[in-house]
Amino acid sequence: MTFFVLIILVVGLTMTTASDVLILGSTSMGYANQQESKVHCRYSKAYSMLQVKCSDPKLEEIPRDLNSNIQVLDASFSRIRDLRNDSFSSYTKLLYIYLGDNFIQNIEESAFAQQYYLEVLDLTKNGCDNLPKNLFQLPYLRRVYLAVNKFGDSVFQTEVTSPLNFLQLHRNKLTKLPEMGYLPTLQNLNVSENMISRITTKELARFCYLEVLDASKNPLNLEEDNCECVIMRRWLKLRKIIFKPEYNCTPAAFERCGNVTFSNETLTIYDECTNILRIQMQTKKARNIWIIVVCCVACFIVIVFLVLLCFHRRNKRKKQKLKKEQQRIAANNANTQLLNSNLK
C-alpha cells in the first residue's frame, strides 16, 4: 500500500513541475529549470526563437526575472499600464513584442531605446496617446500595430529611418495621413475608422511604394469641382495602389478634368522619395559588396596561413626525420667502431 502511495506522490509532483513551464518540441531544450516570475510565464520555441508568453490578468508590468535571451515577448491580454525606460532593459535581443489588449497609457521616451533588433511591435487596443520619438529610428523595425488607441496627428510628426513596411492605425484620432516624412519602404497603411476628411496626391507621394491604403469608415470628401477626385483616381491607378473604400468619380468630373495633370510639387516629392530608396538600396548593395570583399580577403589570408602552416609542418617533419636519420647513422657508426675495437 505504501508503495502505491509513493508512486502517486511522484507522478503528482512530476505533473505539477511540468505544468509550470510549457516547452514545445524536444525536452532537451533546457528551459525546464528556468526561474518563473510570479505570474506564470510559459517558454517555448517559435521558429527556432526563444519565446515567452506572460498573458495574465494579474500582470501589471513587464516581468523582470525572465530569461535575458528571449526573442519573442507576448504579454497580451494583461493589465500593464506603463512602459518605463527600464521595462525592457534586461531583454536586448527582442525581435517581437506583443502588448495588445492592455491598459498602457504612458510610454516613457527611452522605453524601446535598447531594442536594437526589434522588428515587430504590437500595441493594439490600449489607451495610448503618445509614442517615443525614437521608436521609428530603430534600424530593423518593419511592422507596427497601433490600432484602437488615442493617437492624434501630432504623435506622427516625426522623421522615420526604420525600414517600416506595415503601419496599422485603425480607430485612432487622426484627421489626416501621418506626416512622417518620406516612407519609401511602406507598403501597407491602415487608417480606417479615424476622422480623416481629405487625402491628397501630395500626401500619397511621400509613400512612393505604397501598395494598400485602407481609409474606410472615414468622412472622406474628395471635391469634384476642383478635380481632386479625378486626380486621386489617376494617381491610385498609376501607382497601382489598392484603395479602400473604392472611390468613384462622376462621369461629368472625368469629362471636365480630362486634361488635369499632377502638380509639380507632387511629382517632386515622389521623385525625392524614390531617390531615397534608390540611395538606400545602393548603400546596402555597396555594403554587401564590401562584406563580400572583406570575407574573400579573410578567406585568402586564412588559406595562405594554412598553406604556410602545412609547409612549416612538412619542413619540421623533414628536419625531424633527417635528425633521426643522422642519429641512426651516428649510432650505427658508433656500434661499428665498438665492434671493430672489440675484434682487435
Feature-to-residue mapping (PLM):
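Cleavable N-terminal signal peptides of Sec/SRP-targeted secreted and luminal proteins
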Residues: M1-D20
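LRR N-terminal entry segment and analogous cap-like coil->beta motifs
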Residues: A46-F103
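Canonical position 11/12 of the leucine-rich repeat
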Residues: P57-E60, R79-R81, F103-Q105, G127-D129, ...
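Canonical leucine-rich repeat
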Residues: I62, L83-D86, Y91, I107-S110, ...
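Leucine-rich repeat domain C-terminal region
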Residues: Y140-R143, A147-K284
